Each structure stands twice: as C-alpha cells, then as structure tokens.
Amino acid sequence: MDLKTPTSMRILKRDLRIGGWSADTNKLYRLWFELLALSPSYELAKRYRQQNGKLSKEDKDRKPADFEAVLKVFDDFGDVQKLFFKEWWTNRGLKLLGSPGNRPETKLLFKASQQRPADDEKLRRARSYFSTGWHEAHDPDVMVLAIPLNIGRQKALKEVKALIDQHAVQLFQPPTPKYELANKDMHIKSLIDCLSVLYMKAAKPKFKLWQVGVEAGISKTYSGQFDSKTTRRNANNSEEIRHLEMMTYRKFRQAKHIAENAARGIFPSMSKPAHMMNFDPEEFNKIIAAKIKWKKAAIKKLQNEVGT
C-alpha cells in the first residue's frame, strides 16, 4: 500500500486561515510535527499523561530534569503519533504557530466598465471590505486605485509600482505566536536529512551508520554508490564508506538535538539541550511500526469513504 499522505489530508492554502487565525506558509511547521514524534522526551511526556502521571522505574530514572517544560509543550501540541499533520494543524497547530486575525493581502474590490459601471452594489461591496475584512487583516494602510485595463500590463504595473513606492509604509509584522520558530532561515534540506536519518535509524536499528546514510539518501556523492543490503566493506570502498559514516553520524547527532529541542518548544535548533534524553532506536522501532500500522488503516478508511 502507498503510504503517501492522501489528497484529502494535504495542507491547502485555505488551511492557513481558519476561524479567525492565520499563519504564513512554512514547511518548518510540518517538520516540527514530524520531529516531535521522534523525541524521547516527548514520548515520555505522552506516556506520563496517558498513564496519569505513573511511570515505570526505568522511565522515572531517565526522566530529564526539565521534564515540566516538556510536559507543558506536550499539553499544547498533544499526541503527534497517530494523526495526519492536517488534522493536527487544524485542531492545534494553527493556534500555536499562527496568530489571531488574517494576513493583509491584495484584493479586487470590484471591476467597472462602460457596460457594467460602478453601481451602488459594487460600492457597497467596497464599503463592506472596510467594515469587515480590513479590520480582520489588522487595519493595514491601503490604496484604492482605478487601474485602466486598456493601457497594457507593463504600463499599468509601472504606474502601480510608482504609487506603492510613493506611499510605502513599514512591512506588516504579525502578532507573535505562542510558539515562534527559532530560526526561520534554517536550510530545509538539512532538516529533512536529519529527520530521514533519525527515522531510518529507528526503522532499521541494526543498521550500521553508513547503511542508514544510504537508505536516508543524505549524500549525492556516496549514498547512491552503495546498497545497504548487498554492499560489503572492502579495501576498495573503505574510504568512501568512512566518509558516509561520518556524514551520517553528524546528521544523527544533529537530529537528536533538533528533536529534543522541539520537545521543549524550541525549533529548529541544533544546539545540544542541557537535559536531553538518549534516543533508543529499538524503542522507536516499535513506535514507528505501530504508526505505520495505524497509517495503513487510516488511508484504507479514507479511500473507502471516497469510494462510497
């Protein structure tokens, strides 16, 4: 079965504006969600809440010193294991990572022509914008323009640009969300590689690091050279495999830091947390297996619903 996210569970532009809340488009939100699912501290917080504060002796012994901070994040973000990102986003994520109100955007209030002049109904729609949508977008400075459509795109755009330059104001800054991204400019590919390595290490706990690197596809130079199941280390490939091991080790270390920081409400950050828990691939192998089983059933259910 294809485990790709079903179309009905993919985030659309309209999902960034729901119930008086809005957020900017950012792939980092999805990665935060995915990496929380691979955080040992977050998993322990989930277990603690589900078991009404009761933990085994083993779990008590490994509970981090800042566990209360992790519990606070878990209480906000909730269980991220057995639901699609869209479900989590619409129910929790938007209010945690977004802010009240809409983002300002360019709108066509009405179009007038000789055949269809600016009548009272069109003017009413324009007034309606200023009594509703304008306030919902935080009362931005706006220009009401009459743009002739018969002067050509290039001339019209040039004149509009000149007016914008003439009346430019400070760029809009949305209200600070409850959880703000720690680094909006972090390279997405680097984060995806970290996620892939952490996930693959859990999916294949017996794999050596170079095998994890092959399966995670973190290196254009080395990952494609080897097969994780059939390649054997020898004098001819030892140096290349060593380089891949080093790359995978760095990504694995960074991924553990990112996941544990995410559990403390800090994302994305590769800094080593002061009280991070150890990542146990065997433990998360069971968690991933349960998640895959759930996802297969959920996709099948969605497909059946579409078919009916």
Descriptions of predicted regions:
Residues 1-175, 301, 305-308:
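Intrinsically disordered, low-complexity acidic/Q/S/K-rich activation/interaction tracts characteristic
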